[in-house]
Amino acid sequence: MSMILSASVIRVRDGLPLSASTDYEQSTGMQECRKYFKMLSRKLAQLPDRCTLKTGHYNINFISSLGVSYMMLCTENYPNVLAFSFLDELQKEFITTYNMMKTNTAVRPYCFIEFDNFIQRTKQRYNNPRSLSTKINLSDMQTEIKLRPPYQISMCELGSANGVTSAFSVDCKGAGKISSAHQRLEPATLSGIVGFILSLLCGALNLIRGFHAIESLLQSDGDDFNYIIAFFLGTAACLYQCYLLVYYTGWRNVKSFLTFGLICLCNMYLYELRNLWQLFFHVTVGAFVTLQIWLRQAQGKAPDYDV
């Protein structure tokens, strides 16, 4: 079940907790997340104003403004746009209720604990999205997140920045390669599916023509071997474009442009065997699939909430 579990208001300069919800669960996972809360609190001044930390089954999101950070813990499948809309509501209410002088001069932890009442009410509303009266305003937040997605904090970055490098240093060396190998892409669009099918079609056409060229080479003394190579290279390029469209890999965009360049070179070499419409079709499909690969980026955020 997707839901908000807890939230805190923290002063950025020193990590002093100003207010928080008081209904933490006592599970092992939740206790671990409380440690991450404390670690993030010490580093808020060094982080961007909108961040996400993924901790397995839970996500920690926060925003910072005017020296105060608003942090929340939710399940990993809680919609990203709702999470940051929730934080935005906390921020607006806190700024309206307390002036900067009070927050800057606060000495005791949780000196604004009465703000917990608003946190609890808002959390209950956001844990029942159907009852939200602010649905109409979520489109603005959705657009903002797409244009400026939250910075993704890695476990290695969090660990090394807080004096606990021994726990993370071994894994950090290869963390980039491991995470990129298992990185998920954004959901496929209709245009992406069409591009995948067209690329398969071009690959099949190149493959058929390649076998015909082999037959021609066996039946005559013509020098068709280079054409065979061009057809099969074109087939491989089309299939590799399909692979790049479906799976994430390092330097994915660069590879897609190089693959498109190979498709263009193959079709230039096959100019004598194809008419202009055939050449135009193959090159256009290659360009279209390259564009779809570029548009379908890795998932850097949780699923959006439909509005």
UniProtKB/Swiss-Prot annotation:
The chain crosses the membrane at residues 188-208, 227-247, 254-271, 275-295. One of its GO terms (cellular component) is endoplasmic reticulum membrane. It is a multi-pass membrane protein. Belongs to the synaptobrevin family. The modification Phosphoserine is found at S6, S8. The modification N-acetylserine is found at S2. It is found in: Endoplasmic reticulum membrane. The gene is SEC22A. This is Vesicle-trafficking protein SEC22a. Residues 2-187, 248-253, 296-307 are cytoplasmic. It comes from Homo sapiens (Human). May be involved in vesicle transport between the ER and the Golgi complex. CDD domains: Longin. GO terms for molecular function: SNAP receptor activity.
